[in-house]
């Protein structure tokens, strides 16, 4: 299922000390390949894949990745234990390092299929799902969730949820430190309107010291990560990592103690070029890859031109790689 297009490398040990969140339409395999050039140790997540899509759709497309993406987790959306178990087995067979259950997405579309944050109202079902997956595979099974949903947002109810899922065998919880409001707000508003409550997640870590608790929501700097790591076991960044990807270049040294020098922006792009050539040779368009790297150029002369080349000009070019090389020149020495 994987795309062995880069030389085999020793896999780094899976650590959740720092990860990039699963994000629909963003953390596809091209995005993940790019982010991996910047950080060797960051745990990467796929976009959420529903059990129905994996069991009845184009399985190879949903599971495909490049070997360099490890450590790599597949996020699943679903609520039928047997289906989740079958999908977890597919993930393990494809070589994924972890499978994660989405109990945090608030969109109406997934709620109708009993996927995402609405499952926080059904802790026994989530526990059954987790147990089914754990019984099916040897790889890690984790859960990403909110601190509550409207109508079930007390701390006692959060502890009930975590407690039941822990009893099923889950040992790692990624906590988006907001409640999800299941009616009346868009997914975007659900990332902004409910207030961040890091203190609730911190209390959860205090009351469940045996569990690995990873904090997610509103974190924008590695300095903030280091501060929160005094309380939590790991940090997960989402949109900030996507819009400001060069932040990842300092992750290995600042959070994992690596002595390897950080990659420059231009070096990251040079590493991306052969990947783009392979994608084009398979019939793919260059913008499938380059749409994910626009945030690499920020705050210096030529940044705007860089983004224009790769978001506008690339669509009109007879030779898109020439446009890529023009963009690369703008990052020379950076």
Labelled PLM ranges:
Residues 2-334:
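Flavin-dependent oxidoreductase catalytic cores
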């Amino acid at each position: 299922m994987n795309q062995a297009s880069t030389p085999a490398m020793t896999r780094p040990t899976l650590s959740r000390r720092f990860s990039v969140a699963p994000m629909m339409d963003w953390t596809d395999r091209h995005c993940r390949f790019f982010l991996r050039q910047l950080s060797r140790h960051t745990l990467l997540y796929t976009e959420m894949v529903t059990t129905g899509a994996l069991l009845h759709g184009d399985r190879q497309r949903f599971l495909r990745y490049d070997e360099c993406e490890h450590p790599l987790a597949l996020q699943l959306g679903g609520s039928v234990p047997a289906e989740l178990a079958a999908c977890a087995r597919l993930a393990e067979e494809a070589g994924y390092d972890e499978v994660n259950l989405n109990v945090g997405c608030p969109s109406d579309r997934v709620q109708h299929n009993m996927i995402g944050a609405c499952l926080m109202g059904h802790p026994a079902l989530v526990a059954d799902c987790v147990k089914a997956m754990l019984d099916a595979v040897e790889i890690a099974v984790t859960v990403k969730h909110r601190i509550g949903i409207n109508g079930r947002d007390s701390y006692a109810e959060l502890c009930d949820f975590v407690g039941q899922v822990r009893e099923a065998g889950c040992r790692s919880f990624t906590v988006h430190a907001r409640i999800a409001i299941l009616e009346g707000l868009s997914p975007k508003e659900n990332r902004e309107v409910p207030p961040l409550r890091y203190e609730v997640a911190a209390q959860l870590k205090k009351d469940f010291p045996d569990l690995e608790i990873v904090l997610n929501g509103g974190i924008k700097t590695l300095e903030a990560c280091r501060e929160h790591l005094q309380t939590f076991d790991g940090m997960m960044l989402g949109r900030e990592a996507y819009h400001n990807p060069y932040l990842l270049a300092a992750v290995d040294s600042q959070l994992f103690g690596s002595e390897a020098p950080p990659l420059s922006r231009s070096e990251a792009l040079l590493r991306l070029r052969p990947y783009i050539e392979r994608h084009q040779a398979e019939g793919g368009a260059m913008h499938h890859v380059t749409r994910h790297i626009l945030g690499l150029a920020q705050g210096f002369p030529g940044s705007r031109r860089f983004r224009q080349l790769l978001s506008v000009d690339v669509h009109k070019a007879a030779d898109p790689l020439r446009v890529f090389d023009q963009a690369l020149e703008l990052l020379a020495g950076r």
